[in-house]
Amino acid sequence: MRRDFVYNNNAMFNPLTTHYSSDMNWALNNHQEEEEEPRRIEISDSESLENLKSSDFYQLGGGGALNSSEKPRKIDFWRSGLMGFAKMQQQQQLQHSVAVKMNNNNNNDLMGNKKGSTFIQEHRALLPKALILWIIIVGFISSGIYQWMDDANKIRREEVLVSMCDQRARMLQDQFSVSVNHVHALAILVSTFHYHKNPSAIDQETFAEYTARTAFERPLLSGVAYAEKVVNFEREMFERQHNWVIKTMDRGEPSPVRDEYAPVIFSQDSVSYLESLDMMSGEEDRENILRARETGKAVLTSPFRLLETHHLGVVLTFPVYKSSLPENPTVEERIAATAGYLGGAFDVESLVENLLGQLAGNQAIVVHVYDITNASDPLVMYGNQDEEADRSLSHESKLDFGDPFRKHKMICRYHQKAPIPLNVLTTVPLFFAIGFLVGYILYGAAMHIVKVEDDFHEMQELKVRAEAADVAKSQFLATVSHEIRTPMNGILGMLAMLLDTELSSTQRDYAQTAQVCGKALIALINEVLDRAKIEAGKLELESVPFDIRSILDDVLSLFSEESRNKSIELAVFVSDKVPEIVKGDSGRFRQIIINLVGNSVKFTEKGHIFVKVHLAEQSKDESEPKNALNGGVSEEMIVVSKQSSYNTLSGYEAADGRNSWDSFKHLVSEEQSLSEFDISSNVRLMVSIEDTGIGIPLVAQGRVFMPFMQADSSTSRNYGGTGIGLSISKCLVELMRGQINFISRPHIGSTFWFTAVLEKCDKCSAINHMKKPNVEHLPSTFKGMKAIVVDAKPVRAAVTRYHMKRLGINVDVVTSLKTAVVAAAAFERNGSPLPTKPQLDMILVEKDSWISTEDNDSEIRLLNSRTNGNVHHKSPKLALFATNITNSEFDRAKSAGFADTVIMKPLRASMIGACLQQVLELRKTRQQHPEGSSPATLKSLLTGKKILVVDDNIVNRRVAAGALKKFGAEVVCAESGQVALGLLQIPHTFDACFMDIQMPQMDGFEATRQIRMMEKETKEKTNLEWHLPILAMTADVIHATYEECLKSGMDGYVSKPFEEENLYKSVAKSFKPNPISPSS
């Protein structure tokens, strides 16, 4: 048997992505003649793949893929990797088609066998029936489209009705309100000129003339009249004075004896018949009048027929007071001050008719107005109930006529039912005709499909081979990751155990250097495997609560030492609008930030690196960069500015001007305008990372996000890196439903930004029931303290204020030490000797502001002398902010009066708090956390626990046992799944089991399933609940996923090599913290 590898020099094969070019496919199938004869390498079963030359693998990888200086190293790597993988495949007897395992004769036979009858050829007789079925389906779809368009037309028709009805209701209310205001003004006029003038300036003739001449202001009123309040004992004198008798409204007879009357004394000529009639003689009228004077507001009657027009109308009544009322009068004060009542009659029917006559489309709808004060018996105010209308559709609009006691509404309907729209009549037949034609076209195309069926089979074969190659690639990556990470786990574990022993400084330095290198190698492997998982579509994001600000502070701490060594400003700012806790994949979010900040630190030698986080909608118009590389800047336009200082974080020019103070101050000023009614469950963040580094050449900007690509060949030599971080970051951002882009100017710097959609997480209860979020608990001892920050750079000062604000410190920013002296002196003058009053607690000075001039030391001494002279308060402490500081500068700062502690950058809230506790000589108190949120240490979780470690590798067993014993656990080791089953026979005394997944004979999944089966059988027999927490241990980062572990019955997952944080997250779910003695 022979295995033939057929390839040509133009074929492209990438062991990581397994992409075949068209040349390779045709060469594999020997289907077409090439200009150059493909080279055949024949290997028999007895031969080894090791006999392949490096040049053969170089040609397999593509002749032009490698530079001459890089060929030997990269060729040997892939050669050894592929040969090693082939040897493993031979040993495991796995049959995967990584390359074509057939010769030319077999290829020709296969191509000949594929030429047979196809599905369409075999079922040609069914094609007419299929066409008829197609026409029926098109008919059903056409009817569905008709129904959909008809429903849409009904919705639009309803929207128009709603708009027209609401418009009429608003206009009716507005016109009614105008008339009510005029009646109110007339009531005030009567009160002023009839009761406040002596003698009265109003009589019947004056009132009638005035109301007649101002009737144009009250077009909706048929008339107005004024009735005076008359009590019973004043009735006789009142009747003699007016020379008429008070009469009832219904019959015109003398009014019977009552406690109080309201006879009309003034009236408009149109309602002169109301003179002498008692407005309180009717029961409902009496109630309305009493309600008006008690509330001081206008009241309405129920609808009734007006005497002259016989139209439906209502009477509006206003109280008239004879004296001025207090600001908030009581009901008794209103009644006592009442002098009379001004009433106006509204002709509702005429009002609505006039309104509808002014509007377009009046004939299209039917309008009814109701009084629904009594909901069970609504009263018709306007409209004919028997009028013909489309009763299938109606809209109701509420009416407010100013009387809260009475309720009104307007109901609108169309006069006629909706006709079938023209677009429906044309679209549906057109769609049916098109569908019918499509059916005939498909029927004719069926014969053509028969002719291309052979090509389809050919492509199907290529697809099968590509899938087989993808399986081989996945297994290759899984095996390589396991085989590399397993010994690396042993190396890093042993180094960690070595560092726990007594070592000399030189030995410790060697061990720590080896540990750092090992972790760097693991990080590189993880990046390559992440890229592979992304290409395979197997990378998924988790959703857990986490604290963005804590994540960013942690990232800054990773690069703090390097930024100090380079004397560059490294800072972060998070908008107050960004929620404190969000839900998402904290690890992947952190990975993106680390990649971007790491690149900035790597390529920046001076200036600053500024990380800013805010809501993408917060400044959408001005903050979102243009969706183009470099913001559309051409190479001819890039000129390095000669300006010496810029309003940026460090004063150096940046590629993107949005983080300068002119733009940044608008973002800061909007911090307090957080909307409370945003009900969206998601939050869209924008994160920008600005640096003043070397920038990216224009010619390289198009390939920045391509994997394994860098600006040029010198980048890797000078700065290191693989060029894979940005491509992974781009994929992760897209998984977070965001986008990433950048603006870069050579020799100026770069600004990368990305957006990410995360979930809001406002309830602490949701956090407690999930994986513990990465939340930083800051000290609360600084709340209410006051500080002055001296910094001439406004952006940097705003960042400092942000971190101080997180600690609860109120900050005032000044630009110079002279201003600080003035501010401290003003504070001293305005201060209070009472200890409970606020005082100035600290003055924090930026190093740049201190060393900028020689006179600043004298200003510091003056500041100390002024503040120390206040006997009522402790003098504020002076502290210095610095990115780095020399010994001479430190000695000078101490002699000038600064505290011994210098707050080193990059600033983080926790670090500032720790330094200020030293500066202010505060006693460090244990943080008080909400119940259940205080993080337990691994020692408190594992002390006294008996744990079984199952692993076939003796080094891994020693590493795992050493790591667990370090935290007080009692460890027993087993070398296989069978031994573990023997030790875990119920009853046993183990508290947990750490189970390796890939073991010979019985893997960890099978061992776990059998353990769970034993526990289930024990429960069925003895009714005793047994559940041993089992945590998976594996170096295989592709197959050993969290879901697979849960499916087999495991409780958690720990990836090799062990990290203390990951170990804690896993065991914290199964164990509760034990109290441990302080000595331990």
Swiss-Prot record:
A biological-process GO annotation: regulation of shoot system development
GO CC field: endoplasmic reticulum; endoplasmic reticulum membrane; plasma membrane
Membrane topology label: Multi-pass membrane protein
Record annotation: effect of changing S765N: In strain: cv. Se-0
Annotated residues for binding of N(6)-dimethylallyladenine: D285, L307
Effect of L306A: Loss of activity
Phenotypic consequence of gene deletion: Reduced sensitivity to cytokinin (mostly in shoots). Narrow vascular cylinder composed mainly of protoxylem cell files, with no apparent metaxylem or phloem. Hypersensitivity to ABA. Strong drought and salinity tolerance only in the presence of CK. Reduced cytokinin repression of several Pi starvation-responsive genes and increased sucrose sensitivity. More rapid germination, reduced requirement for light, and decreased far-red light sensitivity. Reduced sensitivity to N-isobutyl decanamide. Impaired benzyladenine (6-BA)-mediated repression of the iron uptake pathway.
Key words of the record: Cytokinin signaling pathway, Developmental protein, Endoplasmic reticulum, Hydrolase, Kinase, Membrane, Phosphoprotein, Protein phosphatase, Transferase, Transmembrane, Transmembrane helix
Residue ranges that the UniProt entry lists as topological domain Extracellular: 146-429
Modified residues (4-aspartylphosphate): D996
Sequence positions that bind Mg(2+): D952, D996, Q998
Impact reported for Y273E: Loss of activity
Domain annotation Response regulatory: ranges: 786-920, 946-1071
Effect of L307A: Loss of activity
Activity regulation behaviour: Activated by cytokinins to initiate phosphorelay signaling. This cytokinin-mediated activation is repressed by the trans-zeatin antagonists 6-(2-hydroxy-3-methylbenzylamino)purine (PI-55) and 6-(2,5-dihydroxybenzylamino)purine (LGR-991).
Recorded superkingdom: Eukaryota
Function summary: Cytokinins (CK) receptor related to bacterial two-component regulators. Also binds the synthetic urea-type cytokinin thidiazuron, a potent defoliant and herbicide. Functions as a histidine kinase and transmits the stress signal to a downstream MAPK cascade. This protein undergoes an ATP-dependent autophosphorylation at a conserved histidine residue in the kinase core, and a phosphoryl group is then transferred to a conserved aspartate residue in the receiver domain.
Subunit structure: Homodimer. Interacts with AHP1, AHP2, AHP3, AHP5, AHK3, AMPD, FBR12, WNK5 and At4g15630.
Record protein name field: Histidine kinase 4
Lineage, highest ranks first: Eukaryota, Viridiplantae, Streptophyta, Embryophyta, Tracheophyta
Gene name per UniProt: AHK4
